[in-house]
Swiss-Prot record:
Residues 281-291, 301-316 have a biased composition (Acidic residues). This is Large ribosomal subunit protein uL4. The keyword Endoplasmic reticulum does not apply. Belongs to the universal ribosomal protein uL4 family. The keyword Zinc does not apply. Residues 44-76, 231-316 are annotated as: Disordered. PANTHER family: 50S RIBOSOMAL PROTEIN L4, LARGE RIBOSOMAL SUBUNIT PROTEIN UL4C. The gene is rplD. It comes from Synechococcus sp. (strain JA-2-3B'a(2-13)) (Cyanobacteria bacterium Yellowstone B-Prime). The lineage of its organism: Bacteria, Bacillati, Cyanobacteriota, Cyanophyceae, Synechococcales.
């Protein structure tokens, strides 16, 4: 934020005004001003320079002389670029030199240029009422009271251009009068002093002031807590089909008893009826060895082990 003095028509300091504009960064300020200045000066060119080629010059359709037999050099047209009044080779052609620049860049360049001249900026009170009738001598004397010497140039910026001010200033070659809507980078940088009225400065601050600058959105930091996920926004892997089955459930599934149909099939293969009560409710009853022999079945291994010593003693 910078401050500049405010002077009245008599050249007395009556206060100060603050000027705080959103400008370019120091490392890019010179480049943005260069782009704006180049665009303004290039677009001021008319581009009317134009020359005619040998095809556009009038005449030259007839061959001057025959090709052979005259001893002269071969010639096909009197409008050849080698001849007098002939066409021009690679001459200037009508063209447009307009350069484009983004609107935000142009505004940034204007704010930067004006803020850079704050040390040479003088705010003056509105003096339209003092020019009645408009006199050039009155404005020239006021410039001296404001501190603008006779050999120094000045740019006078007013809110609205009135006829009285224009008639009083137009005969002073070193002073240029522009309205607030005509402010440009070239005029701001090409003078020794910049004079602006109080009303024009207020409108300028309302249009370009720091309060009117767009707010910068805060970007969330990495340490900020993340928002809770809504219940209806399920993440992949949260569905019932995606949930993993615990190993204990697999083990219980493996330990479940077989179905009745499987029991019947197994009993049919072994040649015995299936037990409808299942394997857990079956009770094994010991059978008599004599009954097993009568049925043609072999005695169990335990019984064979008990009867084997008795048979050996009988043989002895």
């Amino acid at each position: 934020m910078a401050s500049c003095v405010v002077k009245n028509w008599q050249g007395e300091t009556v206060g100060s005004a603050e000027l705080s504009l959103k400008v370019a960064r120091p490392e890019t300020a010179a480049h943005i001003l260069y782009l704006a200045l180049r665009r303004q000066m290039t677009n001021a060119r008319q581009g009317n320079a134009h020359t005619k080629t040998r095809a556009e010059v009038r005449g030259g359709g007839r061959k001057p002389w025959k090709q052979k037999g005259t001893g002269r050099a071969r010639a096909g047209s009197i409008r050849s670029p080698l001849w007098r009044k002939g066409g021009v080779i690679f001459g200037p052609r009508k063209r447009e030199y307009n350069l484009a620049m983004n609107r935000k860049e142009r505004q940034l360049a204007l704010r930067t240029a004006l803020q850079s001249r704050v040390e040479d900026l003088i705010v003056v009170e509105d003096f339209q009422e003092q020019l009645n009738p408009p006199k050039t001598r009155a404005v020239a004397q006021a410039l001296l009271r404001w501190g603008v010497m006779e050999d120094q140039s000045a740019l006078l910026i007013v809110a609205e251009r009135s006829e009285a001010v224009e008639r009083a200033v137009r005969n002073i070659a070193r002073v240029k009068l522009i309205g607030l809507d005509q402010i440009n980078v070239f005029d701001l940088l090409n003078v020794d002093w910049v004079l602006i009225t109080v009303s024009a400065l207020e409108q300028l601050k309302a249009r370009w002031g720091s309060d009117a600058a767009p707010a910068v959105l805060e970007t969330p930091s990495e340490d900020a807590p993340q928002a809770d996920i809504a219940e209806d926004q399920a993440l992949p892997g949260d569905g019932p089909e995606d949930q993993a089955v615990p190993e204990s459930e697999h083990e219980e599934a493996e330990q479940t008893p077989a179905q009745p149909e499987a029991q019947e099939n197994q009993a049919a293969l072994q040649g015995r009826p299936a037990d409808p009560q299942g394997p857990e409710e079956q009770t094994e009853e010991p059978q008599d060895p004599a009954e097993e022999l009568a049925q043609g079945a072999e005695p169990s291994t335990v019984e064979e082990a008990e009867t084997a010593p008795a048979e050996e003693e009988s043989d002895d």
